[in-house]
Every structure is written in structure tokens, then in C-alpha cells.
């Protein structure tokens, strides 16, 4: 049986019934930054003791009566209970395909979560799952000494210096949230970030208002002047802690305060039954300077993967043909008909 859920209570009831989930699967996170006409759903498959939930955002395709599905920013993908290595993905795939066709959904794209088990197995008969690049995680099952032993030598030196010059405090209230928004926006401007990496102030206010997301803001403060140098937002779920967003004022870049913030969160999360502190990867999943910055904390890498599924091939080809006729350059992203 397959059905969709759109209510907050029922959505969280399904999440509470699965083996594990991340903040990127919650109802509240799916309602943070919707575009006009976007509709978040949790597509649920149930068979005997098996439960699979796939969170999606359904979007209308302009100038048509068709739709496609995408995922939130972050690491969502399927969550499940009762899945074993003998799981028959083909049975679920038939029902998912029928559900999507009945709802005029042409294609599905979703980022996946490398810390949630069985995602590739569940999606094995539905389109393709491709590796986008590596991400870095700190193993929180190790004790703090073992974790620090995996730091690069240079990072240890930088942290020692940072601890002498800065203090870390937890941000709270609208003033600190507004301050972080300012720091983050300045950082995105410096990096010439594309629009999708910018978030308005109400996004951050709603983020911290949610009891499902459980966000924590850490701020690095200069010991001598009291100036705030940088801020980082972490999200906390059942087993997974995420390094969600971070920013540093331009004038303090050389001091690398964000490294101290990550280390502070690492210490906070240790010995609390969390399994992973995910630092993410490089910009656009590349092994760039951002990736190397994160890798200095841990050699533990996992593959960040993307799920793509063409539900209605005829409609998809027609949309791609129309897009190419109206645009000078090809779109290498999925789906190809979106610019």
C-alpha cells in the first residue's frame, strides 16, 4: 500500500516509527523555504512490517498541467523500518511508479543521506543513484581523545591558538539570530554564491522556533574586544548532528574561528549517544578548499549520492526538447528541462 501524508502530526508519527531519521526528513524543515505552489509530501509505502517514507516537494511545471518532485536542501532521501538485505525493491517500485503517474509527476530528483541505511537498496528499481562526491564526518562513537588524534597536525595548532584568543557561546534570541544572518550573508557575498545559498531572516527565525529541527547556534567571540567573529548553525536529530550553515566576518578570516566552533560542537556531542557529526563536502560536491578544510577534522569519508528518476519518459523528452529550443545552452542538471 502506498499513500501520501501532508499533516504535521501524521508525518512525525511515521518518522517516529522508522529506524532513524535526520532533521532533513521532518515536516517543519520541509516548510522552511517553499516556493509559491510547492507542496511537501511524505510518500509512504507499507507492506507487513516494512515501512518506507520518502519526503518530496511537488512542484508544478510551468505552462503545463504536469508536476515534478524534488528534495529539500540537505540530506533527505528514504527512511525505513523492517528493511533487510532481502527486501524486494521491485514490488515497491511498481506501486511508487503508479502513484507518481497518477499524480502527473514527470520526474523525481532527491539528494540522499549517507548516514541513513538502505537508501540505495530501497531505490534500486527506481531510476538511478549516482555519486556526486565525498563528504566528511566525525565519528562520535570514538572517545574525544581518539577523535582528536585524527585531526591534522596543522588543525591542532590552529585550534590551540584559537582557544587562547576566542571563546564560544551559544546564541539565543532574535538579536543573535539577526547577527548570524548578517555574518552568513556577508560570507555568501564574499564567495559569490548563487541564489539558492541565500536565506532570508524569517528562514532562520523559523529554523530556531522548530522543536523538530533542534537547531543550535554557536558564536565565536574575541576575548580581548568582545567582537563576534563567526557563527555556525548545527542541527541535532536522533543519531546525526549536521554542520548546517556557517559564516565568518571578512576581517576575521585569518583567525579561522569556524574551526573552533566545529571543535566545540564535537565536544558537546561526544558521549551523548550521537553517532555522526556530518561536516558535508566541498562547494558543489568538489574536493576543493572547503572540502580540505573539513577533511582536516577527520579521514572518515562517505559518498554523497543523488537519486534521479524519469517517471513519464514521453512527457520528459517533450519538455527537454521544448527547453532546448528556448535556451541557447544545454542544462546538464536533472531534470534537464529546468533552467
PLM feature spans:
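A short, internal acetyl-CoA/4′-phosphopantetheine-binding micro-motif in the GNAT/acyltransferase core
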Residues: 74-86, 141-142, 246-255, 283
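Conserved acyl-donor/pantetheine-binding loop and adjacent beta-alpha core of acyl/acetyltransferases
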Residues: 59-75
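A conserved beta-strand-loop-helix scaffold within acyl/acetyltransferase catalytic domains
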Residues: 2-48, 53-63, 112-254
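Aromatic (often tryptophan-rich) hydrophobic motifs at membrane interfaces
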Residues: 44, 94-97, 203-318
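Active-site/acyl-donor-binding loops of N-acyltransferases
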Residues: 42, 60, 121-145, 272-339
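Short, high-confidence coil segments that cap the C-terminus of an alpha-helix
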Residues: 38-40, 102-105, 272-274
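A short, structural micro-pattern
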Residues: 50, 72, 104, 129-132, ...
Amino acid at each position: 500500500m502506498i499513500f501520501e501524508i501532508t499533516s504535521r502530526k501524521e508525518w512525525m508519527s511515521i518518522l517516529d516509527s522508522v529506524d532513524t531519521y535526520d532533521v532533513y526528513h521532518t515536516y517543519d524543515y520541509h516548510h522552511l523555504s517553499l516556493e509559491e505552489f510547492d507542496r511537501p509530501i511524505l510518500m509512504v509505502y507499507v507492506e507487513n512490517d516494512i515501512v518506507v517514507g520518502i519526503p518530496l516537494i511537488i512542484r508544478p511545471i510551468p505552462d503545463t498541467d504536469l508536476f515534478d518532485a524534488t528534495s529539500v536542501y540537505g540530506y533527505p532521501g528514504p527512511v525505513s523500518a523492517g528493511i533487510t538485505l532481502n527486501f524486494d525493491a521491485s514490488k515497491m517500485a511498481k506501486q511508487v511508479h503508479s502513484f507518481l503517474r497518477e499524480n502527473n509527476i514527470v520526474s523525481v530528483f532527491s539528494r540522499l543521506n549517507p548516514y541513513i541505511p538502505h537508501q540505495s537498496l530501497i531505490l534500486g528499481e527506481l531510476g538511478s543513484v549516482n555519486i556526486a562526491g565525498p563528504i566528511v564526518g566525525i565519528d562520535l562513537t570514538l572517545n574525544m581523545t581518539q577523535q582528536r588524534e585524527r585531526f591534522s597536525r596543522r588543525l591542532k595548532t590552529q585550534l590551540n591558538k584559537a582557544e587562547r584568543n576566542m571563546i564560544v557561546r551559544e546564541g539565543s534570541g532574535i538579536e543573535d539570530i539577526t547577527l548570524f544572518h548578517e555574518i552568513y550573508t556577508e560570507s555568501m557575498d564574499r564567495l559569490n554564491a548563487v541564489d539558492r545559498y541565500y536565506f532570508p531572516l524569517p528562514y532562520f527565525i523559523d529554523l530556531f522556533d522548530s522543536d523538530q529541527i533542534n537547531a543550535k547556534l554557536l558564536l565565536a567571540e574575541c576575548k580581548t574586544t568582545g567582537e563576534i567573529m563567526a557563527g555556525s548553525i548545527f542541527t541535532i536529530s536522533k543519531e546525526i548532528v549536521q554542520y548546517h550553515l556557517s559564516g565568518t566576518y571578512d576581517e576575521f578570516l585569518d583567525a579561522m574561528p569556524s574551526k573552533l566552533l566545529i571543535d566545540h560542537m564535537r565536544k558537546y556531542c561526544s558521549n551523548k549517544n550521537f553517532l555522526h557529526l556530518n561536516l558535508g563536502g566541498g562547494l558543489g560536491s568538489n574536493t576543493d578548499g572547503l572540502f580540505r578544510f573539513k577533511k582536516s577534522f577527520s579521514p572518515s569519508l562517505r559518498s554523497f549520492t543523488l537519486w534521479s528518476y524519469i517517471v513519464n519518459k514521453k512527457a520528459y523528452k517533450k519538455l527537454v526538447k521544448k527547453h532546448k529550443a528556448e535556451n541557447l545552452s544545454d542544462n546538464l542538471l536533472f531534470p534537464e528541462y529546468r533552467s
